[in-house]
Amino acid sequence: MQREAWAVLLVLLLAGGAVYAHATTTTEEYSRYNVGWNGTSNLAAEEVRTLHDLPPGATLLILAPDRPFTAGEVGYLRTFLDSGGRVLIADEDGNANPLLADLGSAIRVRPGNLSSLSRDHTDPGLFNVRVVGNTTLFAGIETVRVNRPATVTGGDPLLETAILSWDDTDGDGHVSGSETFRTAVVCASEGNLTVLGDPSLFVNAMLAENPEFINNLQPVLIDAAHSRTGTTNPIINAIAWVRETPAAAAGLAGLAVLPVAWHFGRKRDD
């Protein structure tokens, strides 16, 4: 009978582990809790949830921003940049443009469907761009592989497509209609502010494509308050809140100990 009880307990533990693993992962693009190809679970980075008192000289990554910045947060970023901190904004949708304007930057993200013949894949949206600017982010690197980046205007160009590139407006994978070959900038900088038109460089499937770039970026902080690295999964958010709230973690630990204490108390009374 005791052996059967242990077998049932083992099955319950395995089932519970499977349910926990399923409940604490997500398929949301760019999420730190997404272990799939389009998640960022494998990107080595420390999340920050407030822009106040960022460490001087650190590098802050704002990845695929999807939330507005308050005037106070813009002020924190200005102070951070002025103190020698580096900010890298990776955006392909143009959501970063209001922040760039508030920071007084002339850089803008122009969404589109950049494609190129400078590739070794059948997909015209997956291609190599040339390093054309001098920055520590691309030190020792000649080309970077990108995945359907947006065009970046203004600032000092850092990454540029080959001449055999075009904005594939009709999505047919070929130069047609009014489309023409041209070069396009996909990354530019102004001082310590850098804007990259391809947030997918940081997803799990792309990390191995540009290892030197990822290495040059380290160590890096991620702005978890405005980036799409979070999740809408309530279970994951609850667990994250407990981990970040010492009082809640201590309370749960106490609740976990209570049954054990009660069990040993009963044995002592018996």
Language-model features: locations:
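Short, surface-exposed patches at the edges or C-terminal ends of soluble domains, predominantly
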Residues: M1-D270
